[in-house]
Amino acid sequence: MEKQKYYITTAIAYTSGKPHIGNTYEIVLADAIARYKRQEGYDVFFQTGTDEHGQKIELKAEEAGITPKEFVDNVSGEIKRIWDLMNTSYDKFIRTTDADHEKQVQKIFKKMYAKGDIYKGHYEGMYCTPCESFFTESQLVDGKCPDCGRPCVPAKEEAYFFKMSKYADRLIDYINTHPDFIQPESRKNEMMNNFLLPGLQDLCVSRTSFKWGIPVDFDPKHVVYVWLDALTNYITGIGYDCDGESSEQFNKLWPADLHLIGKDIIRFHTIYWPIFLMSLDLPLPKQVFGHPWLLQGDGKMSKSKGNVIYADELVDFFGVDAVRYFVLHEMPFENDGVITWELMVERLNSELANTLGNLVNRTISMSNKYFGGVVENKGVVEPVDEDLKAFALAVPGKVAEKMDKLRVADAMTEVFTLFKRLNKYIDETMPWALAKDEAKKERLATVLYNLVEGITMGATLLESFMPETTERILAQLNADKRTLEDLKTFGLYPSGNKVTEKPEILFARLDLKEVLAKVEELHPKKEEPVEEAKEENVIDIEAKPEITFDDFGKLQFQVGEIIACEEVKKSRKLLCSQVKIGSQVRQIVSGIKAHYSAEEMVVKKVMVVTNLKPAKLAGILSEGMILCAEDADGNLSLMVPEKEMPAGAEIC
């Protein structure tokens, strides 16, 4: 029977510079999903690549004194090197400077123009060069790009436009009837409430103010807008031809099963891209997942901030699979994850060296010490064995459930619960005590067999996340590679097999002080100018009348998670947020528009007064109050929980 196909893509990496670990997280996440789908029996096609056109690259190349093509060749090569270093199993690495891609983009643009979806006009507005994005004045936040926070520049030029509004209602209907199309749910609410429902403006899809792009073949002074160019890689990379000569591969693979992208570019993938596909009369991808960011400390990694950590540097310290473990295991499903050198060392020492590495080492060492490395199932079973067996057989199903929902971090946690259970089994059975009694030799053999079998099952489940570690474990145990189907049976390890004589250390423990000293050598901290001591900034406010504890007790404070937010039209101050509080969703209107954009508010955890009597602000019902602090200059700051807390948690 022919295998069911599974087509997965990452966003293609922009070739403005070397990718940091935050960029690298996405390719590793996609690789884990692709590998697991292969384990499940799917015929997987995994595509990634590089996005190589645009004004930003033209300027970078000019600064470097080389041509744009030379510049992107260098950066694309560096990106591919790091993707390969991280042991990612992609099937296609596409470059938007590939001749066949450029040819198809020109044909796609021409087809959209002939269909009447693209027309010629003049663009006047604001442009963010780093994001390659257009904005109106009203979309800017404090005069800056709402996506990256950097300055925008005025742009006025002849341009071609795409009629986005023509397909808006159709896209809204599609999203409403396909609940899994945009995930997580909070991203869908953001796109609907902030962009689609307020109404789409036509999109500028060409530029004349720079040359580094794909020329519009019937009007070559124009180059195709970088996002129209980049997004089409998902179809050109598998052989799409808009003249009807698409490849057999395209006909097999499209629509994509999963576009895996960063949350910062979800608008392009869930609004622009579906509408482009509708224009081409092509089906839409089955799912777009906007993953969170991997932050350094408490901020998004950025070269301009000087807080960048690179994947190859981490690999030099910890090894490939330890880095894969960290970025996959430490990233929540929706909220941003955090990476620090300290946390990496702690996880390596506790989870990898101790929980996993020590388990494998002890098991092999005891097998050699007591039985010369021979592992035999003598069948001397006790209730603790049945408990272990039931536990081990349940784990694959739990992993499958998590992976089906793209909860990769949770899936890894399930795998490590098996390793922890095996460590507990050692404590329960005490092989060293059994070894002292010759009459219990067969019981000891059974215990060690169960350990080897359990580790083999765990190593099989670990393969999608840490493939090299799986190979090393199986080699030391002299165990054959297994399928997920095999994991429905406990006891497939051949009785009488012999494990390796000297166990290899999977993960060596590291000393935090030594690691930090080496990091300091690698990235010396810049000395910041010493500022004169300033008088402490304090604010005295007029005291309000005292209240009793009973009065205060009437107020109810809870943690709320903002799942959607939009500007209140005709108001300069108000934002309207949909706030999840426990199992309920409340609508709350807040006067914070001057301090936070609607996009910034989404996914934030805030403190809310939840038992205020509902009131109308600007004609909109508000069902609570989001708490803020205000300084002497009138600047507002949201009050947020110091630690991760669930939506609905009581504030007391």
Give the positions of each predicted feature:
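Beta-strand segments within the central parallel beta-sheet cores of soluble alpha/beta enzyme folds
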Residues: 287-290, 474-476, 576
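Helix-rich, typically C-terminal accessory recognition domains appended to large enzymatic cores
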Residues: 120, 343-381, 391-499, 609
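Cys/His-rich short segments
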Residues: 115-168, 172
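N-terminal catalytic cores of NTP/NDP-binding nucleotidyl/phosphoryl-transfer enzymes
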Residues: 2-75, 94-109, 114, 131, ...
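A glycine-rich helix N-cap at a beta->alpha junction
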Residues: 76-91
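Structured secondary-structure scaffolds
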Residues: 1-48, 100-104, 154-369, 411-415
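Phosphate-backbone binding interfaces of nucleic-acid-interacting proteins
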Residues: 531-652
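Intrinsic disorder at enzyme termini
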Residues: 470-551
